[in-house]
Amino acid sequence: MVRGQGVLAESGPLFARLGKRPLVVGGDRTLQAAMPFLKAPLAELTTATAAYQKDCSEAALTDLHQAAERHSADCIIGPGGGKALDAAKLLAHQRQLPVATVPTSAATCAGWTALSNVYSDRGAFLYDVGLPRCPEMIVLDYDLVATAPKRTLVAGIGDAIAKWYEASVSSGHSGHTLIIGAVQQARVLRDILFQKSAAALENPGGDDWREVVDAAVLMAGVIGGMGGAQCRTVAAHAVHNGLTHVSANGTLHGEKVAYGILVQLRLEEMGPGNVLAATSRQQLLQFYSQLGLPKSLADMGMDKLTVAQLQQAATVACQADSDIHRLPFSVDPDQVMAAMVSTTAPAGSPGGKTPISTAQLITSE
């Protein structure tokens, strides 16, 4: 792991350790943003670039394999956000090549995780692929990350803070040392974000900003690496996955995940009557208001979704292999729908297994 201000300019020898013919994989916009930073460190190598188009999809991966074959690539360098990093990691895994990731924003922890998500060509989540190891190298250059819109860091905070709310549930009562350590790291990560996020957003490039970038990109990634599948996703990411099947309105991954945390807490509150979940949800609502994270479907521009679309999203979130079933109680699509439309409800508002009507959906938010 290499991190710091301007570190990409000095990373040429590190990239050269991975190979002499790198294929640089990213999206059109991320390649445009990153290549000025990569030009100098890659000057002594025989480099080609390949764009993954819109999503890390099976069709995109086929094209990337062809590009790697044409170039006789011996390593992969992946600059970009979550989907670009996932594509680079998965391509490297499938071709058995080393990979270096270069995050262009702090929107996700994908640069340091042993996991890639695969989407349809229309952006709907299909499945994830657990990778046997983390990337060989991650280069986090604060100068490059600082070129990303503020919104990406806000989304990264939403994605990172989910680590606590999901890992504390998915880990159960595990006594394994690494899982215990990962859960405690997730709690510390949450506290850091509560304490420093507002100041970080007010002073881009400052000390707090760098600390929050480290938290969102690096610390969040370490938690999944230490804890494995038992410290990853639960309902918050399941809700994200469901929403990708009904809306492609430009909402960022971390924004949907942040909203999904509220849905998860609402499910805990409505089902077992978890008072702590109700308190946590109210705390997050205040935090989200401060940062500009979405608190409801309306905040994501999804208030016009039909009941059928909400049903589809909830059904996807509850499919048999969904991480939502890591909750310590069973849930069904009707309960998920009820939680999705009541994320801003007062603490202790009633809910349960009773199916909700169209009228309730329309008037809930």
Which positions does each model-derived feature cover?
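ATP/NTP phosphate-donor binding region
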Residues: 1-74, 297
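Short glycine/serine/threonine-rich phosphate/pyrophosphate-binding segments
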Residues: 8, 31-35, 83-89, 108-112, ...
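A short, small-residue-rich loop immediately preceding and capping a beta-strand
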Residues: 68-91, 95-106
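A glycine/threonine-rich phosphate-anchoring loop and its flanking beta-alpha core
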Residues: 93-185
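Short alpha-helical scaffolding segments that buttress acidic/His motifs in well-ordered protein cores
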Residues: 161-165, 209-223, 261, 288, ...
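Active-site segments that bind and position negatively charged phosphate/pyrophosphate groups
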Residues: 175-290
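C-terminal charged capping/lid subdomain of soluble metabolic enzymes
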Residues: 275-365
